[in-house]
Regions:
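Conserved class I S-adenosyl-L-methionine
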Residues: 1-42
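Tryptophan-centric aromatic hotspots in well-structured domains and transmembrane helices
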Residues: 12, 16-17, 24, 31, ...
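A structural alpha-helix within SAM-dependent methyltransferase catalytic domains
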Residues: 33, 56-59, 123, 127
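Class I SAM-dependent methyltransferase SAM/SAH-binding core
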Residues: 43-45, 51-97
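Conserved Class I S-adenosyl-L-methionine
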Residues: 51, 175-257
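A short acidic, Gly/Pro-enriched loop at the edge of an enzyme's catalytic core
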Residues: 96-107
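A short SAM/SAH-binding and catalytic strip from SAM-dependent methyltransferases
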Residues: 106-120
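Conserved catalytic/acceptor-binding region of the Class I
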Residues: 124-196
């Protein structure tokens, strides 16, 4: 898959993405305050800002945020969602070409977007827009498999019915990808617990928000939805299920050596 193709993958998923994707827990801010010295006056470039899930966390902290998003539909959804925040500026740009000024931000963040970047070009761009000794923070929500049968059943559904799930899953970042991106710069890894409580509508919407989930008319759609309903019925309590995640965070300074 080309990086250009990746930037359009979610165009027909925007409403479900905005409504049903998990956000990021407030302890993310506590961690960045403690480890990176995050303060409200710091400026954030949120790359692949999408519908604004991470941008909003920083805006509530008092930060000015540039939301850089290449997908028009996602960008418009983010603009609508964050319209009440004076500190938000929407940018039609990408990780490789943000359009931001040199040395203009203290933090570059990427939530659930790192695997869509062209790494070398993105690293050069981030070093350009970061102030000296600025921070790069990459994070994403990863479903917990070990002690949660629901997430294991859900994973099995994706593997069975997802259109190109394996290729997308193989592109998800691993520690070696993060290490390659930071090159000789040091970075730190942390995991924070996160979860969603979903009724049937939310559980369906969570699936439909994924770019690899077949849509109506695809031969996999009807059997996929039947299996999803079976999973929901098996795990629901009082009409709701709890989807468990880790919010995985990697952060470090980009020095440009």
């Amino acid at each position: 898959m080309s990086f250009a193709d990746a930037k359009q993958r979610f165009s027909n998923r925007v409403a479900d993405y905005a409504r049903y994707r998990p956000g990021y827990p407030p302890p993310v801010l506590d961690l960045l305050r403690t480890e990176c010295g995050l303060r409200p006056e710091h400026v954030i470039a949120d790359i692949g800002s999408g519908t604004g899930l991470l941008s909003e966390l920083f805006l509530k902290n008092g930060n000015r945020v540039f939301g850089v998003e290449p997908n028009e539909a996602m960008r418009q959804a983010g603009e609508q969602h964050l319209a009440s925040y004076d500190g938000f500026t929407s940018i039609n740009g990408s990780a490789e070409a943000t359009t931001l000024l040199n040395a203009s931000v203290e933090f570059v963040t990427a939530a659930q977007a790192f695997h869509w970047f062209e790494p070398r070009a993105a690293r050069r761009e981030f070093i350009r827009i970061l102030k000296p000794r600025g921070w790069f923070v990459v994070l994403w929500n990863d479903r917990r498999m070990e002690e949660a049968q629901l997430t294991r059943d859900y994973e099995g559904l994706l593997e069975r019915f997802g259109i190109d799930y394996k290729s997308v899953k193989d592109s998800y970042p691993e520690v070696r990808n993060i290490r390659d991106f930071f090159e000789s710069d040091d970075f730190v890894a942390r995991d924070l617990p996160n979860y969603q409580i979903l009724d049937w509508e939310g559980f369906r919407g969570r699936l439909h928000s994924s770019s690899f989930a077949p849509t109506e008319g695809h031969p996999n759609y009807v059997p996929m939805m039947a299996e999803l309903e079976r999973i929901f019925r098996a795990h629901q309590r009082d009409g709701r299920v709890r989807m468990e995640y880790f919010t995985r965070i990697y952060f470090g300074r980009l020095e440009g050596r």
